[in-house]
């Protein structure tokens, strides 16, 4: 994904929502860190092993958003990632609605904490509410693209939306 969209650059601040087990955080830290600067903030409800140059915050963004306000103060992020996924129940429509709900919560965090022209990447499941969420992304970003990793099964409804060029003045 980074090869296609050139997302990460040295010195950027990155927020990783739903960071457990830490793959995205580790990759981002390798791309953006210089020296011993902590430029990546990881947030999850599950504890995560320590990663160099990553600050981990344990919280549930659905009901503990004030924790992020306290930790970030007025910090703005260049890149916000959301790989959050609810526990699957096996019903495709319910699972889809639940992940879209997490995407909407993530977008609210983007609106609050993203730097102008920032990037937002979120995992979604294709389905009934996908186009509505895509339109919400288009309202907030100059460009929105779909991305399906090569490693993803062809029959999987899991896909990523990549928002480029956050329109801070829209708010």
Swiss-Prot record:
Catalytic activity field: uridine(2552) in 23S rRNA + S-adenosyl-L-methionine = 2'-O-methyluridine(2552) in 23S rRNA + S-adenosyl-L-homocysteine + H(+)
Which residues make up the binding site for S-adenosyl-L-methionine?
A: 22, 24, 44, 60, 83
Q: Name one GO cellular component term.
A: cytoplasm
- Which keywords does this chain's UniProt record carry? Cytoplasm, Methyltransferase, rRNA processing, S-adenosyl-L-methionine, Transferase
> What GO terms are given for molecular function?
rRNA (uridine-2'-O-)-methyltransferase activity
Query: Where is the catalytic site?
Result: 123 (proton acceptor)
Q: Which domain of life is it from?
A: Bacteria
Top-level EC class = transferase
Function as written in the Swiss-Prot or TrEMBL entry: Specifically methylates the uridine in position 2552 of 23S rRNA at the 2'-O position of the ribose in the fully assembled 50S ribosomal subunit.
The record's comment on protein family reads: Belongs to the class I-like SAM-binding methyltransferase superfamily. RNA methyltransferase RlmE family.
The molecule here is called Ribosomal RNA large subunit methyltransferase E
């Amino acid at each position: 994904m980074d090869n296609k969209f050139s997302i990460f650059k040295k010195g950027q601040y990155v927020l990783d929502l739903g960071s457990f087990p830490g793959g995205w955080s580790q990759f981002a830290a390798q791309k953006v860190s210089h020296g011993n600067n902590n430029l990546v903030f990881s947030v999850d409800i599950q504890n995560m092993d320590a990663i160099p140059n990553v600050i981990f915050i344990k919280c549930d963004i659905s009901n503990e958003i004030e924790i992020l306000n306290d930790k970030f103060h007025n910090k703005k992020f260049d890149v916000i990632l959301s790989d959050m996924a609810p526990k699957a129940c096996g019903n495709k429509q319910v699972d889809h609605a639940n992940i879209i709900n997490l995407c909407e919560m993530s977008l609210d965090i983007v609106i609050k904490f993203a730097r102008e022209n920032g990037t937002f990447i979120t995992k979604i499941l294709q389905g009934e509410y996908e186009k509505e969420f895509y339109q919400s992304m288009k309202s907030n970003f100059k460009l929105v693209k779909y991305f399906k990793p090569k490693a993803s099964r062809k029959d999987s409804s899991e896909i990523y939306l990549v928002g480029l060029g956050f329109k801070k003045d829209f708010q």
